[in-house]
Structures are given as C-alpha cells and as structure tokens.
Regions:
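Active-site-adjacent "lid/gating" segments in soluble enzymes
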Residues: 1-129, 133, 140
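Aromatic-enriched alpha-helical interface/lid elements that frame and gate functional surfaces
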Residues: 117-182
Length: 182
C-alpha cells in the first residue's frame, strides 16, 4: 500500500510546486471564504489542510488494508492525495450551489451562512459564544430561552428559509439578547 501526499497531485501543471497547507487552502478556494466581506481573505489559523490531508491518507490506508483482507486481491493499492483536494472537498456543496445559482459564495464574517440565526455572538462579559439553530426545533428552544415566543409568529422568522432571508435582523435580535460589553 502506497499513500502519496503532495501539494497538487502527481500529474498536472502544478505537480512540481511545493506542498504546504496555507497555499493549498488558497488554491482550493477555502481561504477566499474566511473573514469578512469588506476585508481580505484570511488563511486558516492552524495547519487545517495538513491535518485533513493526513486524515484522508490514514483513511485511504485503512480502506486499502480492508480491501486486501476481505477480497481475493493479492496486490496493494496506491492512493494519491493532494493537499488542495482535501481542502476543496469541504467546498464541494458550493460547486453545486454555484451551478444552480451562478453566484459565487462570499465571505460571511462572524454571521453564519447556513441556518439562521447562527454565528459568533459577543456576550455581556466580553467573551464570545458560537451558536447555530439548524432546525426549527432548536429555534423554538432558543425563542423559549430568550423569552421571545413572539419570534415564532413573526413571518420573517417563522421558518429557516424566512430567517435566512432576514439573517441580519434575527442575528441582531439574538445579539441584543446575549448582550454586549459595557
């Protein structure tokens, strides 16, 4: 079993380039999505792409071992894993989104871009909390905790698609509830 890990794969125009996680994150498009819309893209603050690629390599080795042990195969396998492909793998849903809408996903800052409300909220003590309400049930629970059952009747917030259309408004309401530093 041979696991090959490189920056950009064994073939193609970039095969000779050095393989480092930060440039691979940028090459994949991952860096473009990090940060705020009105500011430059931000690289991941740790070796995220390196860790992901190592995980994919370990998984490939385990699958190749499993294949050897559970089949009549007598030869090993070769897996070619590129750093940028590991990062790009996380972005695959955006390819489908682009093909449907023709819109390039933009940086969202600290406000989550999936379910709403979601994102990073500043608390009264100056610390931060990350929260996501990915289902109607979790939004109902949030409304209960906030003492804001009226949000469930507001047509802007009664479903996740409606909350997503009014992302900033619901974010602001939740941020006010969390408080802000004095």
């Amino acid at each position: 079993i041979l696991i090959r890990i490189s920056g950009y794969g064994q073939t193609g125009p970039c095969r000779e380039k050095a393989g480092f996680g930060t440039p691979a994150a940028a090459f994949s498009g991952l860096t473009y999505l990090q940060g705020y819309p009105d500011r430059p893209p931000v690289s991941p603050p740790l070796a995220l792409v390196d860790y992901m690629t190592g995980t994919y390599g370990a998984l490939a080795a385990m699958m190749a071992l499993y294949h050897l042990k559970t089949s009549d195969a007598s030869e090993g396998q070769v897996a070619d894993i590129a750093l940028f492909e590991s990062a790009f793998r996380m972005l695959e849903p955006l390819v489908a989104e682009y093909s449907l809408t023709g819109k390039v996903k933009e940086r969202g800052g600290h406000i989550g871009q999936g379910a709403a409300p979601s994102g990073t909220f500043r608390c009264k003590d100056g610390k931060w909390v990350v929260m996501v309400t990915s289902t109607q049930r979790t939004f109902v629970r949030l409304a209960e905790v906030m003492g804001r059952m009226d949000l469930l009747e507001d047509p802007r917030f009664d479903t996740n698609p409606h909350r997503s259309e009014n992302r900033q408004a619901i974010y602001d309401i939740v941020q006010e509830w969390f408080g802000s530093p004095d």
